[in-house]
Amino acid sequence: NYRAVTRMTAQRVAEMVELIRGETPLAQWPQEWFAVADNIRRKDLLLGNTLVPGEALEVALARGAAATLEEVRRSGLRGRGGAGFATGQKWQACRDAPGAMHYVVCNADEGEPGTFKDRVLLSAYADLVFEGMTIAGYAIGAAQGLLYLRGEYRYLLEALEQTLQRRRNQGLLGVEIMGVKGFDFDIEIHLGAGAYICGEESALIESLEGKAGRPRIRPPFPVTHGYLGQPTTVNNVETLAAACLVARHGGAWYAAIGTAKSAGTKLLSISGDCQRPGIYEYPFGIGVAQLLADCGAASSTQAVQVSGPSGVCL
């Protein structure tokens, strides 16, 4: 049934077994069992934003595609999926690449153990993500966006589809968006099937095309030969959400936050032996000591594992 059940205990498992044996319809199960908490502990620029749907897009459309892309370059925004590649540089390369079609792909295949920031953005800030995809489409000259949703996040699908339909009804997706002639853009959601490797962008594109999710030999890169062999920009959920802030407030505003080499803020998924696990948003440059103090792990911590099981211990 693709429903997520949280906060499992021995008692809850026993109760579930009885409901299953009794063939009790899922609709009659306690609905609190299916509640997935966002558990946001600290908000900053992104999680604390007050943008309304269409606000950032309207500014981008008024500025123009080339100027919007320049603001993204000026902002210093880097990919939030791990590689840290300059977003503006990627968008520019995709825009400049020849092709009959250009595509925007949102990588929502959040499979790294211990990471749940993208899930929170998709459940509580979906408008921001979809608007970021639309702005990216405008900047690179794409008419189609594809969100590749992790198979384990299928329970989010209905709400995400409802958000997309609302945006279409509001004129924020579809034909001649916000009355701009020639700017047509829409978004489809594709479900993954649980393969960890599909978090890698070329394997993700293979999966989108209906093939086995295996990484491609590179070069060529997706920005020139991506989805269906066409120029494609693949960006992380958080990257696209942050692009909305850049579009709305400008590159210089965003670049002034964080550090000289890493602009803006970052969402951190904090879990393990701490009193307050959850999502924390900080400007780049924060020290580990402050993070430990904020999450309630400052007194007895011996090591901090960074980047999940495949990362390192500090």
Regions from the language model: what does each represent?
Residues 1-314:
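Feature of Fe-S/electron-transfer and energy-metabolism proteins
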